[in-house]
């Protein structure tokens, strides 16, 4: 078999697609090898050339299975440890998740090869990024969405970082797809100009990476203490563990009450209903107010709404000027819930099947999409709980011109020592960069950190330690272009590219 016929072998292309897809995981934390994003997308574009739509879809499906099979297999940790099902079923569920997510690259390739079959710049650098933006949008929207492993996040430590505060992370992904297509064109048709343009797209943002779209308010620098309780997930919701959990958080907080204006506990740090803890919260609030310290804590709440009782994953503030009364006046209720973790679709059918569909606290209700900022010790904080921090448009929608900090609290203990918490942390850093605000990130077992407005890590605690992160944090002001306009400019570009590609293609036909 000669070289040309070997490269045309569908099975070989599928195997190579698996490899190129899996290599994309190296672009994300904790590996942080940002060139892997370009290599992976280059492989996807190259291997789907000169194929029928069905063949291209299968190759792209294999590419997606390589990416998501290697990049999201951390979900196995929570399924295996807390799902209560046989190992074979656990593995099957992880495979099904990767296969589902792979349908979106398959759709991308099928459409690309259906409407833009020729190997030219129109296909590779114009139509491909526009179609990719569309299919990635669908992946982040259908069935509440799972926009994990978007390649734009890989550029936090790469040369295209400066694009984030201007057009957002999705625009970086768009540009990565365009320049990878130009590299394919340069290799296939030996067009050096295409390669030069690709390198220019990659490097031109580099000189402005240190441009500040924000101003630091040095006179408002504040001391913050973030408590990392490191409570094992297997014990977190055990009623017998409640008293010990409270002792851990109180014991680590008492040295800072009266010394730190702001103390932060992580998501559901108080593993009990707020209504059950009124006495404890009232006494703690009195102590905090007397010592001029405010506490932000995660807690669960059950409230009557109409003729139903609804459970919310909440953040509340204690130590405010107004004494605490149930329910806490200054609060945030999580809006975007995680399927199976925080709510169960078709629950009457699924809950009886296995413990995985009946996890503790998996019956939450949504808060409102837009909610007031948290007012804490005279500062305004835009808040996101756990998974919500990966949803750039939701965070931006709640962001206000007078926001001084971003706040996210999380509990990644579900995923143990896997790469999942590191990917989550990377996406949280991107929100700081996009919006030009410091981020305070409080977690149960890591990664607890303070992020500067440029997305860089100011301070962080090691994972799986019981510790306190103390930091002086300077708030910021100013509006980045992304904070002002969101993804609208990118969608205008996407529609323009799509119309141009379709019109030009029709004329040529």
From Swiss-Prot:
Keyword ATP-binding on this protein?
A: no
Please verify whether the record's keywords include tRNA-binding.
Answer: no
Q: What is its EC number?
A: 2.3.1.269
- Where's the active site on this chain? 267 (proton acceptor), 334, 386 (nucleophile)
- List the pathway annotation: Protein modification; lipoprotein biosynthesis (N-acyl transfer)
> Per its UniProt record, what CDD domains does this chain match?
ALP_N-acyl_transferase
Protein topology in the membrane: Multi-pass membrane protein
Q: Which residues cross the membrane?
A: 12-29, 57-77, 91-111, 124-144, 168-188, 192-212, 485-505
Which SUPFAM superfamilies does this chain map to? Carbon-nitrogen hydrolase (SSF56317)
What is one GO cellular-component annotation here?
A: plasma membrane
Where in this chain does the record put each CN hydrolase domain? 227-475
Record keywords, A-Z: Acyltransferase, Cell inner membrane, Cell membrane, Membrane, Transferase, Transmembrane, Transmembrane helix
Coarsely, its chief localization is membrane
Q: Give a GO molecular function annotation for the protein.
A: N-acyltransferase activity
Where is it located?
Cell inner membrane
Sorted alphabetically, which Gene3D superfamilies does this protein's record hold?
A: Carbon-nitrogen hydrolase
PANTHER family xref list: APOLIPOPROTEIN N-ACYLTRANSFERASE
Q: What family does the database annotate?
A: Belongs to the CN hydrolase family. Apolipoprotein N-acyltransferase subfamily.
Which HAMAP family is this protein grouped with? Lnt
Q: Which NCBIfam families does this entry report, sorted A to Z?
A: lnt
* Protein name per the record: Apolipoprotein N-acyltransferase
Gene this chain is encoded by: lnt
């Amino acid at each position: 078999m000669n070289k040309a016929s070997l490269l045309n072998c569908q099975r070989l292309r599928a195997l190579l697609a698996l490899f190129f897809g899996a290599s994309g995981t190296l672009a994300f934390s904790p590996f942080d090898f940002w060139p892997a994003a370009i290599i992976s997308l280059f492989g996807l574009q190259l291997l789907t050339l000169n194929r029928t739509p069905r063949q291209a879809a299968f190759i792209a499906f294999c590419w997606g299975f390589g990416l998501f099979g290697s990049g999201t297999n951390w979900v196995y940790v929570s399924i295996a440890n807390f799902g209560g099902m046989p190992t074979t079923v656990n593995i099957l569920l992880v495979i099904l998740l990767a296969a589902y997510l792979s349908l979106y690259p398959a759709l991308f390739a099928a459409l690309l090869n259906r409407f833009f079959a020729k190997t030219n710049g129109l296909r590779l650098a114009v139509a491909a990024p526009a179609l990719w933006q569309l299919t990635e949008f669908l992946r982040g929207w259908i069935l509440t969405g799972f926009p994990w492993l978007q390649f734009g996040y890989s550029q936090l430590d790469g040369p295209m970082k400066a694009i984030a505060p201007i057009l957002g992370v999705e625009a970086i992904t768009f540009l990565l797809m365009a320049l990878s297509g130009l590299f394919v064109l340069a290799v296939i048709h030996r067009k050096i100009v295409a390669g030069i343009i690709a390198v220019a797209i990659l490097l031109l943002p580099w000189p402005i990476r240190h441009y500040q779209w924000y101003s630091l308010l040095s006179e408002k620098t504040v001391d913050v203490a973030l408590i990392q309780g490191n409570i094992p997930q297997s014990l977190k919701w055990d009623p017998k563990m409640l008293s010990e959990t409270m002792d851990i958080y109180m014991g680590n907080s008492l040295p800072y009450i009266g010394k730190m204006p702001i103390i932060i506990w992580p998501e559901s740090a108080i593993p009990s209903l707020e209504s059950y803890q009124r006495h404890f919260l009232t006494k703690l609030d009195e102590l905090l107010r007397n010592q001029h310290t405010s506490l932000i804590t995660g807690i669960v709440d059950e409230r009557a709404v109409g003729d139903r009782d609804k459970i919310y994953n909440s953040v509340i503030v204690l130590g405010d000027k107004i004494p605490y009364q149930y329910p806490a006046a200054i609060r945030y209720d999580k809006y975007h819930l995680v399927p199976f973790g925080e709510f169960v679709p078709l629950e009457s059918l699924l809950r009886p099947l296995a413990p995985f569909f009946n996890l503790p606290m998996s019956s939450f209700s949504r808060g409102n999409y837009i909610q007031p900022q948290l007012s804490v010790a005279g500062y305004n904080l835009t808040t996101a709980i756990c998974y919500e921090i990966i949803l750039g448009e939701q965070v931006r929608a709640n962001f206000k011109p007078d926001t001084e900090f971003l706040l996210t609290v999380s509990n990644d203990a579900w995923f143990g020592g896997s790469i999942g918490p590191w990917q989550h942390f990377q996406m949280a850093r991107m929100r700081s960069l996009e919006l030009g605000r410091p981020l305070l990130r409080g977690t149960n077992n890591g990664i607890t950190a303070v992020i500067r407005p440029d997305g860089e890590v100011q301070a962080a605690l090691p994972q799986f330690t019981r510790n306190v992160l103390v930091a002086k944090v300077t708030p910021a002001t100013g509006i980045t272009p992304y904070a002002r306009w969101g993804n609208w400019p990118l969608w205008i570009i996407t529609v323009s590219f799509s119309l141009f590609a379709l019109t030009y293609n029709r004329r040529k036909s």
